[in-house]
């Protein structure tokens, strides 16, 4: 992986948040706090950037599990304002209005988009910016819900790989139990990112960095990382299949 | 305004829809049908492009008014499949989970994003593409809900001005009562686009075309259209203020 001066990166992230808050002439920022490392990292950065009083965390569980405790741990450690809104009744209301069964992925998409709506309703009413918590590993592989968790005003971590976010989280003082737990989007019980993705973030980032940033040939990546070529081809296929998710809708040129 | 060969433009729009359906390996397209001219035009184009059996219209009222009849008129005229889902109970469920009052704009945003969620839930389950109905006049002035009505897979009309969509609608045979009625996003009773925008689409498009496409000087535009300079400056301000709405969320370069 690239070697980063993490102190400098953190300074850059903090000043980015400060600049956007000032430019947008808003009173603060709001973000969804899931209990995972990405949202915890953005919360720590935001509190450092503009002060805990101007940061509002929304804890929006569907399932009641340990993630909620971890989310509250982040909010209480930082001393930021927060609200807990269980989204089950809203997601159920969507389901009542559909005449077909939802599978886990579709229900997960509704959860993610429901959270986006709640974040923006609060942002509208408080004149806040919505901070996204997406990282580069998710963005490049399409491991997010289109117009859901990827929909925000600014996404401070969007150019940082997951393994780099872990390092930043440690430096910022995010609690270890959050850093060390298996990453999960929490869209269904027992879900983990790495099971979904079919690869560990550690290996995924090593491949993504060489494939996308360094533009290395697949064969050289496989040789350098001492892994089968099909692992690199698999990651390449994730990038290609999710291309449409990284673009605003287009129409024909007139 | 630019002079367009509308027969050619319609052919381009139809083949664009055909191409994207084929490329994406989907079984059809779905779109929200509001009773307005934009969604009616996209419905007519889609039915022409891939056949009425592969087009699903979702009529998603919040208010029960004439727009619903107009939406059903479009669906029945075309013979496409459609469903009517009243979104009030879903929007109410969002409101129940908020501890503050919504104003019209915020409630309108929730309506628009709720419709996006319903469209994508159906698209997921049927392996359909979501067609957006945004036009260039809305896109350039930011007259849409971010991650709401602007959120789709493809937006056939995105490069056509509203006044041009009217012309296309006439050629396609969209009913006159839909073409001739005052455009409205229907987000609250009595709302009209032109009241919100503070300018008629006719004048707005003439200014937008010169300002954005021809990159004319404001003073020359005012002189050419024989309008006060502040009208041009007003349109310019709409474009500037809405710039963030035409971009995916960014983060700092690392």
Swiss-Prot record, chains A, B:
The yes or no answer to whether the keyword NAD is present is yes
Q: Cytoplasm among the record's keywords?
A: no
- Enzyme class per UniProt: ligase
The record lists deamido-NAD(+) as bound by 113, 146, 153, 244-245
Reactions it catalyzes: deamido-NAD(+) + NH4(+) + ATP = AMP + diphosphate + NAD(+) + H(+)
User: So what EC number does this one have?
Assistant: 6.3.1.5
- GO biological process terms on file: NAD biosynthetic process
Which InterPro entries does the annotation name?
NAD/GMP_synthase, NAD_synthase, NH(3)-dep_NAD(+)_synth, Rossmann-like_a/b/a_fold
Superkingdom field: Archaea
Amino-acid positions noted as binding ATP in the UniProt annotation, renumbered to this chain: 32-39, 133, 162, 184
What are the recorded GO MF terms, alphabetically? ATP binding; glutaminase activity; metal ion binding; NAD+ synthase (glutamine-hydrolyzing) activity; NAD+ synthase activity
Which pathway does this polypeptide act in? Answer: Cofactor biosynthesis; NAD(+) biosynthesis; NAD(+) from deamido-NAD(+) (ammonia route): step 1/1
Keyword terms, alphabetized: ATP-binding, Ligase, Magnesium, Metal-binding, NAD, Nucleotide-binding
Q: Which cysteines are joined by disulfide bonds?
A: none
A Gene Ontology cellular component where this protein is annotated is: cytoplasm
Which parts of the sequence bind Mg(2+)?
38, 138
UniProt lists the family membership as follows: Belongs to the NAD synthetase family.
Q: How does it assemble?
A: Homodimer.
| Function text | Catalyzes the ATP-dependent amidation of deamido-NAD to form NAD. Uses ammonia as a nitrogen source.
Q: Which HAMAP family match?
A: NadE_ammonia_dep
- This protein is called NH(3)-dependent NAD(+) synthetase
Please name the source species. Thermococcus sibiricus (strain DSM 12597 / MM 739)
Q: What is the lineage of its organism?
A: Archaea, Methanobacteriati, Methanobacteriota, Thermococci, Thermococcales
């Amino acid at each position: 992986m690239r070697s980063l001066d993490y102190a400098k990166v953190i300074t850059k992230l903090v000043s980015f948040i400060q600049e956007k808050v000032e430019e947008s002439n808003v009173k603060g920022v709001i973000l969804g706090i899931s209990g995972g490392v990405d949202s915890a990292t953005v919360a720590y950065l935001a509190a450092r950037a503009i002060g805990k009083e101007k940061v509002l965390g929304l804890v929006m569980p569907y399932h009641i599990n340990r993630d909620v405790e971890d989310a509250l741990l982040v909010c209480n450690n930082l001393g930021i304002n927060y609200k807990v809104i269980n989204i089950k009744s809203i997601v159920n209301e969507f389901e009542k209005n559909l005449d077909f069964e939802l599978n886990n992925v579709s229900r997960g998409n509704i959860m993610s988009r429901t959270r986006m709506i709640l974040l923006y309703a609060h942002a509208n009413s408080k004149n806040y910016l919505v901070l996204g918590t997406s990282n580069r590993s998710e963005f490049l592989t399409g491991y997010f819900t289109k117009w859901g968790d990827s929909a925000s005003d600014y996404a401070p971590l969007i150019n940082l790989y997951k393994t780099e976010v872990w390092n930043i989280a440690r430096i910022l003082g995010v609690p270890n139990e959050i850093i060390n737990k298996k990453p999960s989007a929490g869209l269904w019980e027992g879900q983990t990112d790495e099971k979904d993705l079919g690869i560990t973030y550690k290996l995924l980032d090593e491949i993504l960095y060489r494939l996308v940033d360094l533009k290395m040939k697949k064969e050289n990546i496989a040789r350098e990382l001492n892994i089968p070529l099909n692992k690199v081809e698999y990651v390449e296929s994730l990038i290609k299949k999710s291309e449409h998710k990284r673009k605003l809708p287009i129409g024909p040129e007139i």
